[in-house]
Amino acid sequence: MEDFVRQCFNPMIVELAEKAMKEYGEDPKIETNKFAAICTHLEVCFMYSDFHFVDERGESIIVESGDPNALLKHRFEIIEGRDRTMAWTVVNSICNTTGIEKPKFLPDLYDYKENRFIEIGVTRREVHIYYLEKANKIKSEKTHIHIFSFTGEEMATKADYTLDEESRARIKTRLFTIRQEMASRGLWDSFRQSERGEETIEERFEITGTMRRLANQSLPPNFSSLENFRAYVDGFEPNGCIEGKLSQMSKEVNARIEPFLKTTPRPLRLPEGPPCSQRSKFLLMDALKLSIEDPSHEGEGIPLYDAIKCMKTFFGWKEPNIVKPHEKGINPNYLLAWKQVLAELQDIENEEKIPKTKNMKKTSQLKWALGENMAPEKVDFEDCKDVSDLKQYDSDEPEQRSLASWIQSEFNKACELTDSSWIELDEIGEDVAPIEHIASMRRNYFTAEVSRCRATEYIMKGVYINTALLNASSAAMDDFQLIPMISKCRTKEGRRKTNLYGFIIKGRSHLRNDTDVVNFVSMEFSLTDPRLEPHKWEKYCVLEIGDMLLRTAIGQVSRPMFLYVRTNGTSKIKMKWGMEMRRCLLQSLQQIESMIEAESSVKEKDMTKEFFENNSETWPIGESPKGVEEGSIGKVCRTLLAKSVFNSLYASPQLEGFSAESRKLLLIVQALRDNLEPGTFDLGGLYEAIEECLINDPWVLLNASWFNSFLTHALK
């Protein structure tokens, strides 16, 4: 066959075919049938274009003798046979000059007279089967398809054959000649049988043996083999008969497919009710730190020593009083708990040697705050299984809450830069492979963009608190241990800094199962006056505990310092995940990496450096009521990181449900934007599934409101 190809086809065509095969890693000496098919296809494309010109008036004319005086332009631009980069360049420039829609796949020709791209097919099978495969693959109304067969049949979009009868007859005659030449050498049968459908990876992948039997067994009823099913799916016409097809497949299914148009979707209904409240395990934007720079005190690194040292940097303590009571709690107990912490810290200092950990006295206020002896008594099932009216507690439906503006402010704050660095640039050995070099370059650029981000501070704070709490829960199960909330960072000048946010006191923690709860009381410093947004602090009792002098542009001002106190709880599994919060960095790095990959594949070279260093370019960050928000690549990194961190801080069943269900609607809207004419059934049911997750969670409500902004702009 290889010899035949080299004799039968023009050397230029043979050379182009060899080049094309090598580009895809195929060997013309081994895949000889494919070699022949590519040469045939190239020759048909060239013959299609030969002798066809457009004159000065744009009329199509055929000129066979080479009249050198004619000022003529070729009617067809040949795209097939060029290397990929060049071919796309040609396609792009045609699209730019003519305004025609850019095709998803490289077409074979462009027709200047009809202003359309043409896909040429040459098949050894039935023309209509091959036509359907082509149409299914390119899925574009705009590209014209023209199929020829070796038996003299042809098929074209809307039976519009583009060329005159004679030109097409020339092509058919040539194909017939090739077939006869092959047959006379005994090559035709193998060539005819070797044709596969429009190749996709799956189709080249032969399924055999057990897998083949499993595939044939797992088909819907009425299909005998995978081939049948595949042919059926490929020729599937989406509009009109899905309902019938569904009912053929199963009697149980009854669905009317409704077209999904720009006017179809409605916004998500957000719940009404009082504004939602803060529910994170620690304060975020409202946190205040007492810090020491370049710590070098005795016992540096032991949390209790660090905490006492930080407390000593502040001189404005005063008699605490309650400024915002907790609606349901016994507020004086919160006040007494704080006074007890101060007193016991004072006691430690009076001792000769400061202990490494501090267990609080089990006072009545702490027992109350930590729910000691509050759990209902457990009774063995054997003793009560005969009780006739044994039933589970009735639990109330959660009260609906409306979206409050504070959660958007929290998110904005999380995307901002602080003046400290919260993660170190990892010192990693020399890169061995080029891919490692690219990977570490990306990681370093990314780290530089996010190391000072507030969301990164939240990660390190979360990791520290969860680690300390889990350790204490295992090491001191019965004790009310005092756990300082600490983080470490570096200043702009590179000096180390230790920060104290407040304290946690943990309750009894006999955690046998992953979901067993340990109660804790958190006490956190803040300069935020809770009376400005009382709804945000519904779960807190807030004390005023001191006055802090702040340096401002107009000199020193004194601001009241508050302590946010609340009872909270967590479980082993939540703490384990909290300790893993650094994964948020990885998740957002991967999202950025896929953006770089997309850019690199278009430009056909690694774009990492340009991506991070081209400051003029802006990228879409998210949707807001104003429209699509854009920002620098650093802002994109920080926004993606903040989203990932908030998913961790505000993790909940409501978020799980909302993410899973809203994603389905998102995909349908994306399909509509990509002109894929999506259809849906039971859209109402999907809305119900999404909206049943919108109850009272601030992060879920914010995401739902973003989703509504997206719908508005996506469907304009």
From Swiss-Prot:
Locations listed in the record: Host cytoplasm; Host nucleus
The protein's assembly and partners: Influenza RNA polymerase is composed of three subunits: PB1, PB2 and PA. Interacts (via C-terminus) with PB1 (via N-terminus).
Positions of Mn(2+) 2 binding: E80, D108
Additional remarks: SC35 was derived from A/Seal/Massachussetts/1/80 (H7N7) by serial passages in chicken embryo cells, thereby acquiring a multibasic cleavage site in its hemagglutinin (HA) and becoming 100% lethal for chickens. SC35 was then passaged 11 times in mouse lung, yielding the mouse-adapted variant SC35M.
Name this protein carries in UniProt: Polymerase acidic protein
Keyword presence, Manganese: yes
Gene Ontology CC: host cell cytoplasm; host cell nucleus
Keyword Manganese: yes
Summary of the function given for this chain in its UniProt record: Plays an essential role in viral RNA transcription and replication by forming the heterotrimeric polymerase complex together with PB1 and PB2 subunits. The complex transcribes viral mRNAs by using a unique mechanism called cap-snatching. It consists in the hijacking and cleavage of host capped pre-mRNAs. These short capped RNAs are then used as primers for viral mRNAs. The PB2 subunit is responsible for the binding of the 5' cap of cellular pre-mRNAs which are subsequently cleaved after 10-13 nucleotides by the PA subunit that carries the endonuclease activity.
Annotated binding of Mn(2+) 1, by residue: H41, D108, E119, I120
Residue positions of motif Nuclear localization signal 2 (NLS2): 184-247
InterPro entries: INFV_PA, PA/PA-X, PA/PA-X_sf
Family to which the UniProt record says this protein belongs: Belongs to the influenza viruses PA family.
Cofactor(s) required, per the database record: Mn(2+)
Example GO molecular function: endonuclease activity
Gene: PA
Post-translational note: Phosphorylated on serines and threonines by host kinases, including human casein kinase II.
Lineage per the UniProt record: Viruses, Riboviria, Orthornavirae, Negarnaviricota, Polyploviricotina
Uppermost EC category: hydrolase
Keywords for the protein's UniProt record, in alphabetical order: Cap snatching, Endonuclease, Eukaryotic host gene expression shutoff by virus, Eukaryotic host transcription shutoff by virus, Host cytoplasm, Host gene expression shutoff by virus, Host nucleus, Host-virus interaction, Hydrolase, Inhibition of host RNA polymerase II by virus, Manganese, Metal-binding, Nuclease, Phosphoprotein
Short sequence motif Nuclear localization signal 1 (NLS1): positions: 124-139
EC number: 3.1.-.-
Cofactor mode of binding and number, as noted: Binds 2 manganese ions per subunit.
HAMAP family linked: INFV_PA
Main location: host cell
